């Protein structure tokens, strides 16, 4: 089973990736892990990627695609793989088609965990932190037991990280939507796209994913 897992920030992609990895004998390949492994191993492509990252520059597609091909060529992907964070552009998606064809490991499905952006703003911008001890809360999913009082230290002062403020969250989602939409269209035209309702209980989301994978595996 060869998959791509997609979803906007806050959609629960990380949680579902862990469940898929625990349930199916496939390699979970995240972009970050892939780059770190290549750099740690000191491969030619890993060194090239490091030279760009150290300068604060984007790693060019030629290098990224090469690292992806090296990773997918490893034996732990023979039983299947799940890509997480790649591809990010149509050019990368087209390169991936060539890579998987060369390796005879074609994609079986692209699973997109779909949650309305307004719901994601609530999920992502609801986090706040105790100034005294650093305990983390969420206004909807994990509020303090007593409003305005930290459960851990009894403090009454809280703050919100800049990354968690609604305006920042909305901008991050906008950027991701603009990036993901062409990819979703690309894979829909290929007949590979499966959309899961991410606005429900974690177990129900995973049940939908399992049903898709069972149907694809037939």
UniProtKB/Swiss-Prot annotation:
Residues bound to Zn(2+) are 130, 133, 150, 153
Q: Which GO terms describe its cellular component?
A: cytoplasm
One GO molecular function term of this record is: zinc ion binding
Give the range the annotation lists for the signal sequence. none
Q: Looking at the keywords, is Lipoprotein present? A: no
InterPro entries (alphabetical): Adenyl_kin_sub, Adenylat/UMP-CMP_kin, Adenylat_kinase_CS, Adenylate_kinase_lid-dom, P-loop_NTPase
Predominant cellular place of this UniProt entry's protein: cytoplasm
EC nos: 2.7.4.3
Question: Which EC class is this protein assigned?
Answer: transferase
Q: Where is this region: NMP?
A: 30-59
State the Gene Ontology BP annotations: AMP salvage
Residues where AMP binds: 31, 36, 57-59, 85-88, 92, 161, 172
CDD domains for this protein = ADK (cd01428)
Q: Where does ATP bind?
A: 10-15, 127, 136-137, 200
Can the keyword Zinc be found in this entry's annotation? yes
Q: Please state where this protein is localized.
A: Cytoplasm
Reaction(s) catalyzed by this protein? AMP + ATP = 2 ADP
Q: In which pathway does it act?
A: Purine metabolism; AMP biosynthesis via salvage pathway; AMP from ADP: step 1/1
Q: Which NCBIfam families match?
A: adk (TIGR01351), PRK00279.1-2 (NF001380), PRK00279.1-3 (NF001381), PRK14527.1 (NF011100)
Q: Which family does it belong to?
A: Belongs to the adenylate kinase family.
The entry describes its oligomerization and partners as: Monomer.
Q: What is known of its domains?
A: Consists of three domains, a large central CORE domain and two small peripheral domains, NMPbind and LID, which undergo movements during catalysis. The LID domain closes over the site of phosphoryl transfer upon ATP binding. Assembling and dissambling the active center during each catalytic cycle provides an effective means to prevent ATP hydrolysis. Some bacteria have evolved a zinc-coordinating structure that stabilizes the LID domain.
Q: What is this protein called?
A: Adenylate kinase
